[in-house]
From Swiss-Prot:
NCBIfam families: PRK05182.1-2 (NF003513), PRK05182.2-5 (NF003519), rpoA (TIGR02027)
Protein name listed in UniProt: DNA-directed RNA polymerase subunit alpha
Species this protein is from: Roseiflexus sp. (strain RS-1)
Top-rank EC class of the record's enzyme: transferase
Record note on domains: The N-terminal domain is essential for RNAP assembly and basal transcription, whereas the C-terminal domain is involved in interaction with transcriptional regulators and with upstream promoter elements.
Keyword Transcription found: yes
Function: DNA-dependent RNA polymerase catalyzes the transcription of DNA into RNA using the four ribonucleoside triphosphates as substrates.
A GO molecular function held by the record: DNA binding
SUPFAM superfamilies: C-terminal domain of RNA polymerase alpha subunit, Insert subdomain of RNA polymerase alpha subunit, RBP11-like subunits of RNA polymerase
EC number: 2.7.7.6
Gene that encodes it: rpoA
GO cellular component term, pick one: cytoplasm
GO BP annotation list: DNA-templated transcription
SS bonds (residue pairs): none
Length: 323
């Protein structure tokens, strides 16, 4: 295998929510290869925290109004989506807001535990325009990746309002590839990548995390031949063996809805084999994964031949039983 010259990384600009990084020298074509891959991972796979639902005292749905508050609930929800925070807890965390009397309500008025940090305390939420008015609100903070629409979650109790959760802390990434001269070669790539964050993560840390994600996926591919020859079939609860190639299939291959996919990912269920090892009771115990999502998973597994239809035995299952 030919050696690949390792590039150097230079920090061109380093700020709290903006960074420019130069990576060079790169073999011809590798500027776009790395730049595009890093950009996609930065925009989709960096973990973050967001408010996923709220409950306002005296309010039963998002189309309500609050006496003495200038904005209606729909506007308040839109403003809350802009609150950026860090959560150091693995589980959902409750934060609260209680404000009385005329005045502007900002993110700084939120009462949060020590494991939640609000990074834009001056963010505007609403205005109370009467001295005898008040707003009391409870919010739920969760960690996740990417974007989770409010309409792709299981039904909530009356009074709890779901919010589109923007988990990603990296809203924008640009990259430029230029040719530089190294010795006699004039077609060497130089990659300049710009990263904007929401302040909850430093651009350099985001770049490092994105690279680690790519390394993990690449390592799996690099180890493919060794793992495929060494791996022993896994046995599911129904007693049938799960071949290694099926076990290691990413759940993305099931083409699940965003809601169901995010439920599994948050529970660290990333492979089809992990799903096949779980019975219905175990699946329903996954947070926010309800009966509808469980049935969707079952239908997708049947559709791809991983499990037999009810009342039928698949070819693989029949061969296993007869053997």
């Amino acid at each position: 295998m030919l050696d690949i010259a390792m590039p150097k990384i230079e920090v061109v600009t380093a700020a709290e929510n903006y960074g420019r990084f130069k990576i060079e020298p790169l073999d011809p074509g590798y500027g776009h290869t790395l730049g595009n891959a890093l950009r996609r991972v930065l925009l989709s796979s960096i973990p973050g925290a967001a408010i996923t639902k709220i409950k306002i005292e005296g309010v039963f749905h998002e189309f309500s109004t609050i006496p003495g508050v200038k904005e209606d609930v729909t506007e308040i929800v839109l403003n809350i989506k802009g609150i950026r925070l860090r959560s150091y807890a693995e589980r959902p965390v409750k934060i609260s807001l209680s404000k009385r009397g005329a005045g502007v309500v900002r993110a700084a008025d939120i009462d949060a535990p020590s494991n939640v940090e609000i990074v834009n305390p001056n963010h505007y939420i609403c205005t109370i325009d009467r001295d005898d008015a008040a707003i009391d609100m409870e919010m739920t903070v969760e960690r996740g990746r990417g974007y989770l629409p409010a309409d792709q979650r299981d039904a909530l109790p009356i009074g709890e309002i779901p919010i589109d959760a923007i988990f990603t802390p990296v809203p924008k990434v640009n990259y430029v590839v230029e040719h530089i001269r190294v010795g006699q070669a004039t077609d060497i790539d130089s990659l300049l990548i710009e990263i904007w964050t929401d302040g909850t993560i430093k651009p350099g840390d985001a770049l490092s995390h994105a690279a680690q994600v790519l390394v993990q996926y690449s390592q799996t591919i690099a180890d493919f031949n060794r793992l495929s020859t060494e791996a022993e079939p896994t046995t599911a609860p129904n007693g049938l063996a799960i071949p290694a190639d099926i076990y290691d299939t990413p759940i993305e291959e099931l083409d699940l809805s965003t809601r169901t996919y995010n439920c599994l990912k948050r529970a660290d269920i990333t492979k089809v084999g992990q799903v096949l090892e779980m019975d219905e009771k175990a699946l329903l115990s996954v947070r926010n994964l309800g009966q509808k999502s469980m049935e969707e998973i079952r239908d997708k597994l049947i559709e791809r031949g991983y499990i037999p239809r009810i009342g039928q035995t698949s070819h693989a299952a029949r061969a296993e039983i007869e053997g």
